[in-house]
Amino acid sequence: MGVALTRLAQWTAAGYETGTLEITPLNESILNEITKFVESFSYKYPQEAKFVFVEPLEWKTYLEPSAFELGYVVSATTAESEETGKDGQPLLFLSVPYIKVRSFGQLSQLLSIATDSKLQEAQACIEANRDPVVKILGPDYNEMKEDPTRLTLLDTIIKDKETYMKRKVAILLKQLDLHLLNHSLKYISLEISLNPGTFKKDIELLKRFSGKGEQTVLESIEYTSDYEFSNGCRAPPWRQIQGEICYVLVKPHDMETLCLTCSTEGVFLNGGKTEEEGEINYERKGEIYKDLVTCLKDKSPVFSENMSKHEIRFTEEQQKDNQIFEKPKTEDGHSSVAGSEKSKIEKISFGKSPMTKRLEPSLNWRVTVDYKDHKSSIKDSQEEKQGKLEKSSSVSVAPSRAQSHRKGGEKVEETVSESSSESEEDEEPPDHRQEANADLPSEYWQIQKLVKYLKGGNQTATVIALCSMRDFNLAQETCQLAIRDVGGLEVLINLLDTDEVKCKIGSLKILKEISHNPQIRRNIVDLGGLPIMVNILDSPHKSLKCLSAETIANVAKFKRARRAVRQHGGITKLVALLDCGQNSTEPTQPSLYETRDVEVARCGALALWSCSKSHSNKEAIRKAGGIPLLARLLKTSHENMLIPVVGTLQECASEENYRAAIKAERIIENLVKNLNSENEQLQEHCAMAIYQCAEDEETRDLVRLHGGLKPLASLLNNTDNKERLAAVTGAIWKCSISKENVIKFREYKAIETLVGLLTDQPEEVLVNVVGALGECCQEYENRVLVRKCGGIQPLVNLLVGINQALLVNVTKAVGACAVEPESMAIIDRLDGVRLLWSLLKNPHPDVKASAAWALCPCIENAKDAGEMVRSFVGGLELVVNLLKSDNKEVLASVCAAITNIAKDQENLAVITDHGVVPLLSKLANTNNDKLRRHLAEAISRCCMWGRNRVAFGEHKAVAPLVRYLKSNDTNVHRATAQALYQLSEDADNCITMHENGAVKLLLDMVGSPDQDLQEAAAGCISNIRRLALATEKARYN
């Protein structure tokens, strides 16, 4: 931090000792980085945050004592922290307006309190404490010469804890210093763009658009000096040392003449020309702008307005001038202007910073590209697009090549069925382009200038431009779109098609970062980037393989990209990366060799994880032999490897073929083992994989046998990570389908914990929690446990939701609890039955069916069920009308509900009036055994009112019922025999049964071990026999 502040921070003319920080982009960047570092210090380094500074940092603050709340003793003019050092002094003391801070923990807390004024506080602190490192560590603490990235063995066994802690803080400060130096390079490297040629172009252009008319942008613009030095500068030599290039007098339409300084740092307003001597006051009077046009737009509203009218024409003129002025060779004038800055940079000691090495241009270039070669390259690529020339390799290639490559490589898209799990970015989002007049940050324009070097520069410029571009925050959308808008994506993709490894690596590193943006992803696919990346997977260079696979992982977030990867053979190559250790030819040290292999496999797994959201890709992974390799990688101890591996398995486990293979490869054992990991993300994906696989009974048993139920139950206690909680509760839900697992969960107190999760949780968690309770409550002991833990009320409260999956599960859980009379009383008191009944109107068939099933135990166990059902206005009519549904599950559940409703004679009369008999009869011709059983039971019950027996015969329900006796389901036999017994009370029905062969089938069932079936079959045969005897008797009489 000390080196960065002394050598890079820009101070006012008063100098480093007494001046203040200037308002410049570089200073603002340094302040932002320091603020981020201090803000995150408390939670990143909790032990180091407690270290007490040798001397307090003291400055004049903008904060008031009232801003400090918890953990502080506050009065009208003072505030002090309750936290104190060994000497009993507070670690933070504010006496308006001065503040003293003695630890990073308190500094971090202060910045969180400051919110909007945190940068002001940071600036005031740095200006008041010119060498903060000395105050923090003491004047005798020498600068470290060791590697700052690791502690030595001596450090770990040192007895003096205070010295040890000071050492760790010193390392962190050294790392911050290096970070600030590296981070500042992007501002220094971009000064290369501001040279005499740049300003000369801009001034000449503005002159063309200036004059006396109202539509002109300016009245006049001219240099203060007509003399031009050989290097292109017009500033005096002693000012050129400061980076100044020239001075211009600008007369806008709406204000007095402005005197502007054009320098390598930008454009700013100076003190103007003195009237007597005509000398220029060089002192800066305002902020620095990135160029002349931006400065004038800010100063003059009329200029801004008129400029917007001429924007297109002005841009065209600029592009014409670029072809004249822009040359890849560095001008001599430029080097002399930037000389002082270069010497300033060279003085900075970067130690062994990786940035230094990264900025060194390669000397081993195969081809030299100058301006003429570049023009011919464009011409070649245009001919190539028409198929007239063969593809050639070059470092700097034209943007049009990306398009020709794409068109040549495209195949006819096959029609594929994509997985239902593909919910991510399947819709094409609108392509947002930056507006011409948008108020864009300086980074946007700086990146665009770098892209120009990529397009037309020589090899050195290409490498430096790639390195400089990476120093920007490429996670920002502005930076990503800046690369795209100026044609940088095409260039980056074409650099992948060269033979230069460094160019490929630099390009892939940038593409990897910016491909997190959905628009950029789609642009990469449109430009044919994926086939090239897939080909790079065959490269012998492991670093290239890694970067290519990681970029594919980012891009393959939508259907078209996943399909493209598969169509170009990417799945097979990615699967091969999982086994790359056996195919490697790079001679390296054993430890490094193993590490690189692990990294290659990890990146391959990441890409497969993204691709595995497609059904066709899942099948391709399986056919390529991916499952055994994933199973082998699952045994590794590298957590960063395990996460994508388990993530891929989790996606693929939705397919039945995969679940069988997962069992065969004994993957469940390793999934269970990794549930005990400390990594929350790994726990989440393991639980999710178990959730997918536990549809199978054998898998549920394996989870129990390998001890997976206990860690699942223990993970329920940590509710902070909602994604992990959803995965864990999902795994518990599916495992609870097996009764043996439910017993174990009861032992581990999981049911009580699940009840506690019924409130204040997101729907993703609630669906699984309620599903698990629904399965657990099939057992009597668990129903009692849920009631005693107060689980009934939150379950009933969830009946008013709108989430389909949640409603299906909660109705099942409420229905399971309703089996117990005491729980049923609570449900009735909370108006739960009415809520269930209202769900019969839900548009989703699954919700209707689940609600109808839940009503069955409610009606069966209610104290006055008949009266309760009749109290629901229109409720019986609603139930009867549901018999018109096309959904078999809805029909079966409604028939079951009618069976219970019809136990009350008054209710039976009402549903008969609503036409239940013809609707039930209409359903008789079904082959679904579940529906057959409950339909037969409903018919049996409905026969007990009036002439319903006769009506069923008239509606031809008897003959289909006889066929039910041929089913293989004993439950269907019993229900059918009971229905036929009731129907056989009518003579015409007996005749129909006899004609359809019922007697023979019923005789076979009289010998059944099921007593109810025996009695019903015998009773039916008895009625048929009595009718036959009566007929015989009548004939002879």
UniProtKB/Swiss-Prot annotation:
It holds the Pfam family Arm. One of its GO terms (biological process) is cilium movement. Residues 316-353, 376-439 are annotated as: Disordered. Residues 316-334, 376-391 have a biased composition (Basic and acidic residues). GO terms for cellular component: axoneme; ciliary base. Its main location: cytoplasm. The modification N6-methyllysine is found at residue 545. Highly expressed in testis. In males, also detected at lower levels in lung, brain, liver and muscle. In females, detected in ovary. It is found in: Cytoplasm, Cytoskeleton, Cilium axoneme; Cytoplasm, Cytoskeleton, Cilium basal body. ARM repeats lie at residues 477-516, 518-557, 528-570, 615-654, 656-695, 739-778, 821-860, 864-903, 905-944, 946-985. Keywords: Cell projection, Cilium, Cilium biogenesis/degradation, Cytoplasm, Cytoskeleton, Methylation, Repeat. Signal peptide: none annotated. Coiled coil: none annotated. InterPro entries: ARM-like, ARM-type_fold, Armadillo. PANTHER family: ARMADILLO REPEAT-CONTAINING PROTEIN 4 ARMC4, OUTER DYNEIN ARM-DOCKING COMPLEX SUBUNIT 2. Component of the outer dynein arm-docking complex (ODA-DC) that mediates outer dynein arms (ODA) binding onto the doublet microtubule. Involved in mediating assembly of both ODAs and their axonemal docking complex onto ciliary microtubules. Component of the outer dynein arm-docking complex along with ODAD1, ODAD3, and ODAD4. Interacts with CFAP61. This is Outer dynein arm-docking complex subunit 2. The lineage of its organism: Eukaryota, Metazoa, Chordata, Craniata, Vertebrata.
